[in-house]
C-alpha cells in the first residue's frame, strides 16, 4: 500500500504552520500532523506596517527541515497564504524593501480616486472583483506615489506565496487564484489587465502570466540532497479552503471562517451584472476553472483583537459566558471600515454602539456577544444577497476553517440564516493545499474526488436552525438595514 507524504505551508495573518499530510491510496485515508507552528505579526518600518518575510522564510525552512529530520521522504510541498500583498524583487532576485501589509493605511482615498478616474462599473467589468480599499490595485498606486525609489529598483512583483515558492526553488510563478485577489486580472482573459495596471503606474513587466494551480514551480533541495517538487497549489488560502469544503451539490454555500469570513458559492461562470456590482460581490478564481462567487466579511478579526486587549486566554470559557447572555442587545456593522485596524477594537465597538444609540457592551462576554450576533446577522444578509444573485435558495451552508470550532457562532449562523449548517473541516486551507498536491501527484483525479476524501476523513458537525431563537426573530428587523461596504 503506497503512502504519499505532502507538506502544506499555511500562512495566516497571525500565525503560520508547516503541516504533514499522509495519504494512503488504498483506503483513501488522509491524516494531518502539525510539524511546526510560529507566530506572524506586523512590524512598523519607516512608518509602514510590514511583514517580516525573512523571519517567516526561516520558520518555513525550519519546518521543512523538521520533517526531513524524521526520516520522511516528502513527495511535494505547497504554500498558501492571505491575498493581495506582494514582494518586490530586483533583477538579481533580491528583495526590494519590505512587503507592506494590507492593513496599513497607505491606500486611504485611492479607491475613490480609481472610481473617479476609471469608473466603478468599468473596474468591475474588467476584474469582477469586490471593491476593498487594500486590493493590490490600490497598493501599487500607493507604492508608485509614496515610494518611487523602490519602483526604479524593482524588476518583479510576486504575491506572498509565490515569493516563498521562489525562495525555495529560485523560479518565478504567478498563481492564478491568488492573482485574482489583486483586482488586476481581467476576468475574461485570465491575464493582467493593462488598463488597470496602467492606472497604478506599475510596469506590466513586473508580472508573468498567471498559471492555474497544479503546476510544479521547481524543486527544493532538502538537507539530505533530495529534490522535492514545490507545487503551485491554490495559493490564496480561501481558494484552498473552498477546495476542501465538502459541498454536497451546487445548492450548497460555503463560509470560510477565520480572521476573515468569506461566504459564497461555486460557479462555472462569473457574476458581473449590475446586481453583483451593487452588492459588491467578488468573482475570485478557483480550481478547475471554477469561480468563487463570494463576499468578504470582516470575520473573527474583531474577536481576535478583543481577546488580546481583554487578556482572555480561555476562549471556550468566554464562549460559555457569552452564550448565557441575551441575544441582539448590542449590534454593529462588522463590515464598517472603522474595524479594519483601530487602535483599540474594544473601544471602537463600544463607540459604534454608542453612536447608534444602543446599550454599550462593557465586559469581555458582552463584547463577544456583540461580535457573534452581528456576524451571524451579517451572514444572513449576505447569504440572501447571494441567493438572490443566483436566483435560487441554498439548501445547506458549510462552515470551514478555524472559526467552525465556535459552536455558538455556528448555531447563531444556522438560526439567523434559517439553513442547515455543517461545520468542518477545521483545517480547510491546509487540506485544500494538500488536495491540489495529491492531484498533481496523480493520486486523485479532481476536486470532487478529493471532497469525497474529506467527507470520509474529516470530523463534521451538523447544526439545525431553530426558528424560535432570539436571533431568528431579530433577522426580519435586521435584513432591510443597509450595511456599509469596506470601500465606503
UniProtKB/Swiss-Prot annotation:
Specify which residues bind ATP according to the UniProt entry for this protein.
13-17, 259, 304, 402
Q: Name one Pfam family in it.
A: FGGY_C
What reaction is this protein's catalytic activity?
L-rhamnulose + ATP = L-rhamnulose 1-phosphate + ADP + H(+)
Annotated metabolic or biological route of this protein? Carbohydrate degradation; L-rhamnose degradation; glycerone phosphate from L-rhamnose: step 2/3
Entry's EC annotation: 2.7.1.5
Which GO BP terms apply? glycerol metabolic process; rhamnose catabolic process
Catalytic residues at 237
Q: Which family does the entry's similarity section mention?
A: Belongs to the rhamnulokinase family.
Specify whether Nucleotidyltransferase is a keyword of the entry. Answer: no
Which cysteines in this chain are paired by disulphide bridges?
68-222, 353-370, 413-417
Its GO CC terms are:
cytosol
Purpose of the protein: Involved in the catabolism of L-rhamnose (6-deoxy-L-mannose). Catalyzes the transfer of the gamma-phosphate group from ATP to the 1-hydroxyl group of L-rhamnulose to yield L-rhamnulose 1-phosphate.
Molecular function per GO:
ATP binding; glycerol kinase activity; rhamnulokinase activity
Protein encoded by which gene = rhaB
| Enzyme class (EC, first level) | transferase
NCBIfam families tied to this protein: PRK10640.1 (NF007925), rhamnulo_kin (TIGR02627)
What cofactor does this chain's UniProt record say it requires? Answer: Mg(2+)
Give the keywords, sorted. Answer: ATP-binding, Disulfide bond, Kinase, Magnesium, Nucleotide-binding, Rhamnose metabolism, Transferase
Annotated protein name in UniProt: Rhamnulokinase
Q: Does the keyword Transferase apply?
A: yes
Which residues make up the binding site for substrate?
83, 236-238, 296
